[in-house]
A protein has these predicted regions:
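Nucleic-acid endo/exonuclease domains
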Residues: 9
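Cytosol-/stroma-facing membrane-proximal "stalk/adaptor" domains immediately downstream
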Residues: 67-91
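Anionic N-terminal interaction surfaces
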Residues: 1-6, 57-59, 66, 82
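Non-transmembrane, membrane-adjacent beta-strand/coil modules in membrane-associated proteins
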Residues: 12-69, 90-91
């Protein structure tokens, strides 16, 4: 299952370890930062996604590295191009 999806102008988060709102309107997002963490001792590689909103709050979550998540992150700039959202890939 994918870590997130975008539909009807809303960013939906499907990850278990996200302790804030899981539905974020795209109009309220200022920046999405994506970082990559190597897996150590059998933990597996992960993507670390930080969503910064215009009101100053941030939401972060982890996604595992897989082919589906790689494709999802490659399509992210095209999915949010109608909104003034900066996407920072730090890997």
């Amino acid at each position: 299952m994918a870590g997130f999806h975008i539909a009807n102008g809303i960013f939906y988060i499907h990850v278990a370890f996200c302790f804030k709102k899981r539905r974020i309107p795209l109009a309220s997002i200022r920046r999405i930062s994506i970082d990559f963490m190597r897996g150590r001792k059998g933990g597996g590689a992960r993507y670390f996604v930080i969503i910064e909103q215009k009101d100053g709050t941030t939401t972060m979550f982890f996604m595992g590295k897989s082919k589906t998540n790689d494709a999802l992150l490659e399509q992210l700039p095209q999915a949010v191009q109608r909104y003034p959202i900066k996407i920072n890939k730090m890997y």
